Each structure stands twice: as structure tokens, then as C-alpha cells.
Regions:
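Extended, folded cores of ATP/NTP-driven motor/assembly subunits in large transport
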Residues: 2-407
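P-loop NTPase motor domains
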Residues: 55, 62-81, 92, 256, ...
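Hydrophobic anchor at the beta1->P-loop junction of P-loop NTPases
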Residues: 444
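Conserved lysine of the Walker
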Residues: 452
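Hydrophobic positions on the alpha1 helix immediately C-terminal to the Walker A/P-loop
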Residues: 455
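Post-Walker A helix-loop "phosphate-sensing" segment adjacent to the P-loop in P-loop NTPases
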Residues: 462-472
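A short helix-turn-beta junction within AAA+ P-loop NTPase domains corresponding to the substrate/partner-engaging
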Residues: 488-492, 701-714
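Conserved P-loop NTPase
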Residues: 729-779
Length: 779
């Protein structure tokens, strides 16, 4: 392999540096210079890192896995042969104080701390015994020898665009890392036991005459034959010494499935294809020559039927296969090495973890080994500095490199978010912040008993106990009342016979989103009468009469600065009767049942607290006749609460149970569609719950709302619903298994395009559970 060795020697020669014994921990950091855009320099080598997100490889179907594998192979093939690449998986331990500050509910001494303690205990129970304290990140670091920073930047700009494009084909989000983000990786590794400190400020450090190394380096580093010690923690660098003939694609994820701080890196040195082909052709020629010489010797001994020795035949077969890979199957030749560093709090724990890792490698018929007397070089190789100091390289093709695929399962971990369950594959916590999404509206879909209401109530509990946001609930099944009352909220029961009333004409100076509240209210009254006489049946003359009467009814109230008694529909009825037009009497007669008749609940003065931050509108007993009008008044009340809160800078969360009911009536369907599109602008979020997915999807409006929602919780589904959702949301057969005949609280979460299988359980021996459950005998 004269030619190939020459190429490798050239790379080794350029990487070779004079060894200097480090006299301080700062000198042990092999970076010489950094730039704010994230370019690092070590010798004549410049490096740039890209962070990329995980994808759902583990739960993908065989066909999807093949497609992902081929897309990842394309990414590897796109790597420039003039540079080297390092793919790094970083298991980073989450700081306990940071976790508690971001997720646990602080006590407020408002009479609800008992529930906060129960909720916090539930959260802490989900952390213990799982990998929840470990957060995994992925980086791709590209290194290249250039004369100066300008040439390096030009190169990285071109290569970076290519890398991010190929990652997007894999549905992985790639992003460039700046200097602070790259340095944070090393600080988290070297100073993992320290709490999060101030962010790195390059200008401030330069003014003080300090080096960036002071921010990342530990207090001490001690290296021995087969391990090292950083501060009070122990570490060891391993490398892949021998590979199996066939490696399964889950080996990398299994090697990283250890609840410890660790990093695994795969260094890749691509070889120019033309050079690789020439070398393999020369090697094949050498093999054929050896076979010919062997046969000639056998013929000279009159052994004309001798079979070519197995080792020669195998060598010829493998060389031909390699040449075929390079020339007809678009494979590239590359050198690679896999290194891994893991950390522990004690030497005993370190040795135990090392044995666990070696055992995983043996399971895959591979052999990992400890780097003896090379722990410094090994550490500098495995960390994403962009350099390689270990030269135990293995010749690989694109396929054999791609099988070391760095993907496993998507995670959802958004700081400051709400807990929604655990990843069914990795058991990691799923924490999402709907406020950070482009469209934070949500649907929860599932058959009866699948856990829809429980999931919504859990979210309501978190919001009620951790924020000052307003929570408004449309409750057609009377399922939320007990919880709302326990959280010091207000339950407004609306029916023809209830003792609680909502005045349909309630209005204050903040009503609507207009400078003139009267205009908004006049439009509402027109909509109200359209519900009474039938949509489209109001004539222009009747609309004019209603507008005139509305102004008359509110005149004194507005003059008093909205301080006098609020008018009711009865006042409007009397005003209509005073009008000279015959149409006015017709309008009064059409509305008499709902104003002076037996269904006059919305013609009374409001006698409940509509200012409470948590309100459940119980419309179970509304009845078919009163439902359209009841929906209109209730939704008007909800929307105006959203507008008023927006003007105060306050967030509003709306939960609508049995969402499909809203689409039986054109007004409520149109209202929620408009609300869905506009509410983000008003700092509001809508959540729809339903078990009748098929009926909901009969509405094109509902289908559009569902398809455009960035946050969905899909629980156990009926067969017909499952098929509809699979088409609408592009769910694969494997993913559908997570919403097929599964228990309560299990399913799929879709967040920002990520589709993650989850499971969610809550301790039954708690007051919160009894408030949230709807199971008979447990309430």
C-alpha cells in the first residue's frame, strides 16, 4: 500500500507537532487561539464544530432505517478529502441545582404548597434510576490545514452549508457553534462538578489579560498509565482495537447508554477516490500475481488439480469486493478510529464502568482496549478540539463507517418547560415549552380512557402552581370542576336552570381589541341574533335597528365611565319594543324565548366571579336549544379575557374538552379557527381534547388546525382514527404501534416536528391524582 501509506504519512506529518511537557493545566489544553465565530486553531490546523440533533432511528421501520442509513452515507461521502472530520457524542450530566431551578415548582405559601410538594416528589421520582440526569449532544467537528484564518473561514462557510443541508435530509437540525458554545463543552467536561457560572465573554477576558483557557481548565490534571484524574474525578480513554466482520447499527447507542459523563468520538480521514482505486487495483494485481506464481509452482510439481489456498482466495475476493465498492457502488475509502472517554467519582466506579463498556463491545464481537501511556493523547483525540493524536487507524468504506451511526431517538428537553412524561425508548424526561414554539396550540387525541383529560389536568396543575397565567376551561362533561375548585378557581355552571348567570351584554372599557368597545359589542349582538333567527336571515334593515338599539342601551353606561349598572338583554328587548319599525318587534319576538322566556339565563346579570385566574365553564346541562347561544356568549367571554390579559402582558391558556362539539356549530367552528390563528399574537394558547377524532376530521377547518399544530399528544387510537392520523401527520407503521392497543398515558408526542413515543404515570397515593383521575372508584 505504498501510495496509500504516502497519503496517510502526509496527514500524519502535517499533524505532527513537537511535544512539550505541559507545566500547567492551561498548557495541557491543545488549543492555541480562538475566534468569536467558533474557529479554533491548533498549530496550522483550524477547526469548526457543528451541533446536530438526534433523530428517531431506533423506532423507525426497516425501510426508514435503510433510507436514513443511505442519507447518512451521503453525508459521509460529502466530507472533503482535504480535511478530517470528528463525530462526537457527548453524555453531559445535568447540574442538579440547574435541573431543580428549571423544573421543580417553588413554594409560594398561598395554600397550594401541599400540591407543589406532591408534584415535585413525582418529578424527582422520575429522575432517580434513569438517564434523566444525562443529556446527550452530538457534534461534527471539521479540521483542515490552512495558511490563515481567512482561508479557513472561507472553507468552513462552504463546507458548513453542505453539512447542514445533508443533516436536514436526515431530519436532523444542524447549527454552527460559536466560541462560547464550543468552550462550554470543555468547561462542562473539565469542571462538571461546578454550578453554571457567568457566560464566557471574550472581550472581558482579553481586557483583564486572562486566557480563555482559564475559563475551561480544571484545578488539576494527573495522568497515569491507564487512567487520569481531573480535580477529584477519575477518567479513562478507550479505543476500538478490533472490529467484527459485521457490526450492528445499534452498537454506538449501546456504548453510550451509560448514566455517566462520557464522550465517544469517531475520527474520519477521507481518502481521494482516484487514489484509493489505484491502490486497490495495485493490491489486486499483487494478489493475482501471488496466485499465478503459486499455480506455476504447483504445475511444476505436476499438481495440475491443486485448489488455490483459502487465504489467497479470500484475499482476492475481499480485494475485488473493495474495488467494486469504490467503482460501482459509490463507496469511498476512509481511515477511522473510535475513541471514548468516561468519567467516574471513584477509581472503583471507573473500573466497573470500563468493564461494562468492554462487555458491550464484546457483545458486538468487537474489542475495545485502554490506551496505555497515551491517556493525554487519547483525551485530546476524543474531545472535540478538532485534532487527532492516536493513529491506530482502521481502513473503512463509507458503509462500514456509516454503520457506526450516531443516532438513536429524539428527545424533548426545553429549559423552563413543562413535564409531559418519559421517552418510551430512552426513559428520559420529556420537557416542552409551548411558549417557545412558532405555534404553541395543541391537540390531545385518544379513545375514552386513554388519559386525555388526565394529561390536560397535569398541564393545568403545572401552570396553576408555577405561573400567574390565566387558565380558562370549556368543560362540556363536568370533568374539571373538582380540580379547579381545589386550585382556588371558579366553576361557572351554565344551563337554563342553573343559579349562576353570565350576562351576554357584559362589557367594560377593555372589551374587544378596538379603541371603541361599543363597535365590537355591536358586532357580537348581530352574531347573537343571527344565532336566534338563523345564519344569514338578518336583513340589512334589522341589522341597522339592532345597531341603533345597542348604542341606546349602552349610552348611559358608557357616559358613567363604565361604572353604572351593566345593561342586559332585557334592556335591549325593551329598546326594540320602543322602536317604530315593525321589524324591531319581529326581532323582539324572535328573541323572547331567550330573554323573557324559560331560556333566559344569559339575560340575567352576571352573579359569578369572572375575574378569577382559573375558570371552568361547565356547559354540560346547556341543552340543545341553548347550546348555540351558550357557546356564543361563553366564547365571547373567553376571547375578551384573552384580549384584556394581552393588554396587561399576561398569558392565557384555553382548554376545550370534547373539541369536536365545537364543530357542530358554524359560529363556534369559525370562532376557534380564527382564535387558533390569532391567539399567539395575544399571548394565548389553545388546547383541544377529543375522543371522536373521526368526527373532528370531517371538518376541513379542524383538519387544517390539527395539521398546523406544533404540539400534539396522541394517545391510544381507534383503528379508523389511527389510519386517518397516519396520513394527515405522516406517521410510520412502527410509530403507529405506540398508539395501538396501549395503556392509559402512553402514546406519541409531536413537538416542533419531533415525534417521540412516551409514557406517563402519576403516583396514585396522592391528592393530585385523585383530583385528576376520572376512573370510577378513584375520583
Amino acid at each position: 500500500m505504498v501510495r496509500l501509506i504516502k497519503t496517510l504519512q502526509q496527514a500524519l506529518k502535517m499533524d505532527r507537532e513537537k511535544f512539550k511537557v505541559p507545566r500547567s493545566v492551561q498548557q495541557a489544553i491543545p488549543i492555541q487561539r480562538i475566534w468569536p465565530d467558533g474557529v479554533f486553531q491548533s498549530g496550522t490546523k483550524f477547526s469548526k464544530s457543528f451541533r446536530f440533533s438526534d433523530i428517531n432511528y431506533a423506532i423507525a421501520s426497516k425501510e426508514d432505517k435503510t433510507e436514513m442509513f443511505l442519507d447518512y452515507s451521503e453525508l459521509l461521502n460529502a466530507l472533503d478529502s482535504g480535511a478530517s472530520a470528528k463525530i462526537t457524542l457527548n453524555n453531559r450530566r445535568i447540574n442538579k441545582e440547574e435541573f431543580e431551578a428549571s423544573l421543580l415548582l417553588p413554594m409560594k405559601e398561598d395554600g397550594l404548597d401541599e400540591y407543589r410538594k406532591e408534584y415535585n416528589e413525582m418529578l424527582l421520582s422520575k429522575v432517580s434510576g434513569t438517564n434523566n440526569s444525562i443529556y446527550q449532544e452530538r457534534y461534527l467537528t471539521v479540521s483542515v490545514h490552512k495558511k490563515n484564518i481567512d482561508e479557513a473561514r472561507t472553507y468552513f462557510a462552504r463546507v458548513g452549508t453542505d453539512i447542514i443541508t445533508h443533516l436536514s435530509k436526515l431530519s436532523s437540525i444542524g447549527e454552527e457553534m460559536d466560541a462560547e458554545q464550543r468552550l462550554q463543552i470543555f468547561r462542562d467536561f473539565f469542571r462538571a462538578e461546578e454550578p453554571q457560572c457567568f457566560p464566557f465573554d471574550m472581550k472581558a477576558f482579553a481586557k483583564k489579560g486572562s486566557s480563555f483557557k482559564d475559563w475551561i481548565c480544571p484545578q488539576s490534571m494527573e495522568f497515569s498509565k491507564d487512567c487520569f484524574k481531573i480535580n477529584e474525578r477519575f477518567g479513562r480513554v478507550l479505543y476500538m482495537q478490533d472490529y467484527a466482520s459485521y457490526v450492528k447499527d445499534d452498537m454506538i447507542s449501546e456504548l453510550c447508554d451509560l448514566s455517566r459523563d462520557l464522550m465517544l468520538s469517531i475520527d474520519i480521514l477521507p481518502v481521494p477516490t482516484d487514489e484509493a482505486v489505484r491502490e486497490i487495483q495495485n493490491r489486486l494485481l499483487g494478489v493475482e500475481t501471488n496466485v499465478t506464481n503459486w499455480q506455476r509452482r504447483q504445475n511444476a510439481n505436476n499438481n495440475f488439480s491443486a485448489i488455490v489456498p483459502y487465504d489467497m482466495e479470500l484475499q482476492r475476493k475481499e480485494t475485488k469486493e473493495m474495488l467494486d465498492d469504490l467503482t460501482t457502488r459509490d463507496q469511498r475509502m476512509m481511515f477511522g478510529i473510535l475513541t471514548m472517554v468516561h468519567m467516574a467519582d471513584s477509581k472503583k466506579q471507573l473500573d466497573s464502568d470500563t468493564e461494562s463498556i468492554l462487555s458491550v463491545a464484546r457483545k458486538h464481537l468487537c474489542q475495545m482496549a485502554t490506551l496505555k501511556w497515551q491517556q493525554v493523547d487519547g483525551l485530546n483525540t476524543v474531545l472535540p478540539y478538532g485534532i487527532r493524536k492516536i493513529n491506530a487507524l482502521r481502513t473503512l468504506t463509507t458503509e462500514s463507517t456509516a454503520v457506526l451511526i450516531p443516532f438513536h431517538t429524539q428527545e424533548i428537553m426545553q429549559p423552563g418547560g413543562i413535564y409531559y412524561g418519559q421517552n418510551a425508548v430512552s426513559k428520559n424526561m420529556l420537557v416542552a415549552d409551548r411558549r417557545k414554539l412558532l405555534n404553541g396550540n395543541s391537540f390531545r387525541l385518544g379513545v375514552s380512557g386513554s388519559g386525555k383529560s388526565f394529561s390536560a389536568k397535569e398541564e393545568i396543575v403545572d401552570l396553576a402552581l408555577s405561573t400567574e397565567d390565566d387558565i380558562l376551561i370549556l368543560d362540556p362533561e363536568s370533568e374539571f370542576g373538582s380540580l379547579v375548585e381545589a386550585l382556588n378557581g371558579e366553576v361557572i355552571s351554565i344551563s337554563a336552570t342553573s343559579h349562576t348567570h353570565l350576562n351576554a351584554l357584559d362589557m367594560d372599557s377593555a372589551y374587544g381589541n378596538d379603541k371603541n368597545p361599543l363597535i365590537e359589542k355591536s358586532e357580537f349582538i348581530l352574531s347573537l341574533f343571527e344565532q336566534l333567527v338563523g345564519a344569514g336571515n338578518l336583513s340589512a334593515k334589522e341589522k341597522s335597528i339592532l345597531d341603533r338599539c345597542t348604542a341606546d342601551v349602552y349610552r348611559e353606561y358608557i357616559r358613567s365611565g363604565y361604572q353604572s349598572e351593566v345593561p342586559t338583554l332585557k334592556d335591549l328587548y325593551r329598546q326594540l319594543m320602543l322602536q317604530p319599525e315593525e321589524e324591531a318587534r319581529g326581532l323582539a319576538l324572535s328573541s323572547e324565548l331567550f330573554i323573557n322566556g324559560s331560556l333566559n339565563t344569559f339575560a340575567q346579570k352576571t352573579n359569578v366571579n369572572t375575574k378569577n385566574r382559573i375558570i371552568a365553564y361547565d356547559i354540560r346541562e346547556l341543552g340543545e336549544q341553548l347550546m348555540p347561544l351558550g357557546m356564543l356568549v361563553t366564547l365571547d367571554s373567553i376571547f375578551n379575557r384573552v384580549i384584556q390579559n394581552w393588554k396587561k402582558g399576561k398569558t392565557t391558556w384555553i382548554f376545550a374538552d370534547e373539541f369536536y362539539l365545537l364543530f357542530r356549530y358554524q359560529y363556534s367552528a369559525d370562532f376557534f379557527y380564527r382564535l387558533y390563528k390569532r391567539i399567539r399574537k395575544y399571548q394565548g394558547f389553545v388546547t383541544g381534547l377529543t375522543q371522536n377524532v373521526e368526527e373532528l376530521l370531517k371538518s376541513d377547518t379542524a383538519r387544517l388546525m390539527l395539521a398546523n399544530s406544533e404540539f400534539l399528544i396522541l394517545l391510544n387510537q381507534a383503528t379508523t382514527d389511527r389510519d386517518e392520523l397516519a396520513v394527515l401527520l405522516n406517521i410510520s407503521e412502527n410509530q403507529l404501534s405506540y398508539i395501538t392497543n396501549v395503556g392509559a398515558g402512553k402514546g406519541l408526542i409531536r413537538c416542533s416536528g419531533n415525534l417521540v413515543p412516551f409514557e406517563n404515570s402519576f403516583p396514585k397515593n396522592t391528592k393530585l391524582y385523585r383530583l385528576m383521575t376520572t376512573k370510577p372508584g378513584e375520583c
